[in-house]
């Protein structure tokens, strides 16, 4: 039987349609909500789902699969669970949680999923990076050897931080923990403007966990007024955000910082603060019916912080020589550094800056307890001139505290003890610094040099801050810059500041 040309054409068309009929279908694995409440959804039917995979509910809300059990999957919801009902469809996305990263993020405020919340529109050209990745291995790393200047005399001289280090800032509420972190960001402005190439620039990522929205807005204003937003990224999971977002925010910020580290640049990531992340994780774990341990935290709360902080690293020259420095913040209760979370993070980090309430109220700000604060690797990264200048000051301060405690009994002291008390009082006064006024490292060297070498010994304590401003204007700026060289303070270099310091001391005695 022969078809007419028109019929033959229709037959061919039908055959091709039937052949390609199934090609446009996309098969998704779906499940159904068994129960929902307190931000946790139990879903039946997602048999092939991966741990940590993103899912999407019928209402458009996203979630992450954390508990993979025989009968159902425990999913924590990123957002309000009021729109999710029993029996709703849940679709696998097939992707593990990822966030945008790249230079397009600089100057922006984003949430824990990398969605902009600053009203400046969508992000421009960027790449996406996994939130949870393995930390660099031993072979890919190099020991910390470059300084990361904070602009604070007390930190840069006594507890120096290197690029690639993890230095904990720990203290009670209202002791100035965030102030140290913000000063460090502000100090990078003049450090970055001095850098000749991209590999010297330090980009900052500030992760706000469980803070008030007004506090985050205030921080954005401070950074924008100081033109510091141009090299900073803010990740905000505020107190009004659900616990899963507060848990995720540090990992998101870390992934954004790792873009710079892995491309031969330098990043500083501030986690403010990890105590609130641990509380959010405890809330999620208890709602997922995971067994509680000490202080009702789950058994893997140590791993929660260790896998995050191990991602801070100084890369070897073969892998680009980039670095990411971590400054985690922990809030203590009534100065108890031996609680569960503080001891965990102290054991993970490479040192800690301890802030104390009584030091703060004595007017010593930043309120650093020099005896408890330590930097385990930072001295290898400290500038040679700074190391020469403040080498003995930590020991002198320790002796001063010992003698000062003894002197309270009012017994007569010999001349040596009185000299030690006198010098110690000056060495305690010199590191004081107003908030949001970081000092360039070469100026810090001059000020500390004057204090350590006895130029302030006969000066009233209340005139030291005026003297500090005066000597910085008298010392030759070229000489100050020469302190940054590898040679440090040679005998020839010491002679010129000695003469200037002697002369400028006279009006303040």
From Swiss-Prot:
Keywords: ATP synthesis, ATP-binding, CF(1), Hydrogen ion transport, Ion transport, Membrane, Mitochondrion, Mitochondrion inner membrane, Nucleotide-binding, Transport. It is found in: Mitochondrion; Mitochondrion inner membrane. Transmembrane segments: none annotated. Coiled coil: none annotated. The keyword Mitochondrion applies. The record marks 373 as: Required for activity. One of its GO terms (cellular component) is mitochondrial inner membrane. The keyword Membrane applies. Pfam families: ATP-synt_ab, ATP-synt_ab_C, ATP-synt_ab_N. ATP binds at residues 171-178. SUPFAM superfamilies: C-terminal domain of alpha and beta subunits of F1 ATP synthase, N-terminal domain of alpha and beta subunits of F1 ATP synthase, P-loop containing nucleoside triphosphate hydrolases. Its main location: mitochondrion. It comes from the Eukaryota. InterPro entries: ATP_synth_asu-like_sf, ATP_synth_asu_C, ATP_synth_asu_C_sf, ATP_synth_F1_a_nt-bd_dom, ATP_synth_F1_asu, ATPase_a/bsu_AS, ATPase_F1/V1/A1_a/bsu_N, ATPase_F1/V1/A1_a/bsu_N_sf. GO terms for molecular function: ATP binding; proton-transporting ATP synthase activity, rotational mechanism. Gene3D superfamilies: 2.40.30.20, ATP synthase alpha/beta chain, C-terminal domain, P-loop containing nucleotide triphosphate hydrolases. F-type ATPases have 2 components, CF(1) - the catalytic core - and CF(0) - the membrane proton channel. CF(1) has five subunits: alpha(3), beta(3), gamma(1), delta(1), epsilon(1). CF(0) has three main subunits: a, b and c. Mitochondrial membrane ATP synthase (F(1)F(0) ATP synthase or Complex V) produces ATP from ADP in the presence of a proton gradient across the membrane which is generated by electron transport complexes of the respiratory chain. F-type ATPases consist of two structural domains, F(1) - containing the extramembraneous catalytic core, and F(0) - containing the membrane proton channel, linked together by a central stalk and a peripheral stalk. During catalysis, ATP synthesis in the catalytic domain of F(1) is coupled via a rotary mechanism of the central stalk subunits to proton translocation. Belongs to the ATPase alpha/beta chains family. This is ATP synthase subunit alpha, mitochondrial. It comes from Triticum aestivum. The gene is ATPA.
């Amino acid at each position: 039987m022969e078809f007419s040309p028109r019929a033959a054409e229709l037959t061919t068309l039908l055959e091709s349609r039937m052949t390609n009929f199934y090609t446009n279908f996309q098969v998704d694995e779906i499940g159904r909500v068994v129960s929902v409440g307190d931000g946790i959804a139990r879903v039946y039917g997602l048999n092939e789902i991966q741990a940590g995979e993103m899912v999407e509910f019928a209402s458009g809300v996203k979630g992450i699969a954390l508990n993979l059990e025989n009968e159902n999957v425990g999913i924590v919801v990123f957002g309000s669970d009021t729109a999710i009902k029993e029996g709703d469809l849940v679709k696998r996305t097939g992707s593990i949680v990822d966030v945008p990263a790249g230079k397009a993020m600089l100057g922006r405020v984003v949430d824990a999923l990398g969605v902009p919340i600053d009203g400046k529109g969508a992000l421009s050209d960027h790449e996406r990076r996994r939130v949870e990745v393995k930390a660099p291995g031993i072979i890919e790393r190099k020991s910390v050897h470059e300084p990361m200047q904070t602009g604070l005399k007390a930190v840069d001289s006594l507890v120096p931080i290197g690029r690639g280090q993890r230095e904990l800032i720990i203290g009670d509420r209202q002791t100035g923990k965030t102030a140290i972190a913000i000063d460090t960001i502000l100090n990078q402005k003049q450090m970055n403007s001095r850098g000749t190439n991209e590999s010297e620039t330090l980009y900052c990522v500030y992760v706000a966990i469980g803070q008030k929205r007004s506090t985050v807005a205030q921080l954005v204003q401070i950074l924008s007024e100081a033109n510091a937003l141009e090299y900073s990224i803010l990740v905000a999971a505020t107190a009004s955000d659900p616990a899963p977002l507060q848990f995720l925010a540090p990992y998101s910020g870390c992934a954004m910082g790792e873009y710079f580290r892995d491309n031969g640049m330098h990043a500083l990531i501030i986690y403010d603060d990890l105590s609130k992340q641990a509380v959010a994780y405890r809330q999620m774990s208890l709602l997922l019916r995971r067994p509680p341990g000490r202080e009702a935290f789950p058994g893997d709360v140590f791993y929660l912080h260790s896998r995050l902080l191990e991602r801070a690293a100084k890369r070897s020259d073969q892998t680009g020589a980039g670095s990411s420095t971590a400054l985690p913040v922990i809030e203590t209760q009534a100065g108890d550094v031996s609680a569960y979370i503080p001891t965990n993070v102290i054991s993970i980090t490479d040192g800690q800056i301890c802030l104390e309430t009584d030091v703060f109220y004595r007017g010593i700000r930043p309120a650093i307890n020099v005896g408890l604060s330590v930097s385990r690797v930072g001295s290898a990264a400290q500038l040679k001139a700074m190391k020469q200048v403040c080498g003995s000051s930590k020991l002198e301060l320790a002796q001063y505290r010992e003698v000062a405690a003894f002197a309270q009994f009012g017994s007569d002291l010999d001349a040596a003890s009185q000299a030690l008390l006198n010098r110690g009082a000056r060495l305690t006064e010199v590191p004081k610094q107003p908030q949001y006024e970081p000092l360039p490292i070469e100026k810090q060297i001059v000020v500390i040099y004057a204090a350590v070498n006895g130029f302030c010994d006969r000066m009233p304590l209340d005139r030291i801050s005026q003297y500090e401003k005066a000597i910085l204007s008298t010392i030759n700026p070229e000489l100050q810059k020469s302190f940054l060289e590898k040679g440090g303070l040679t005998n020839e270099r010491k002679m010129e500041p000695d003469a200037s310091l002697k002369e400028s001391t006279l009006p303040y005695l």
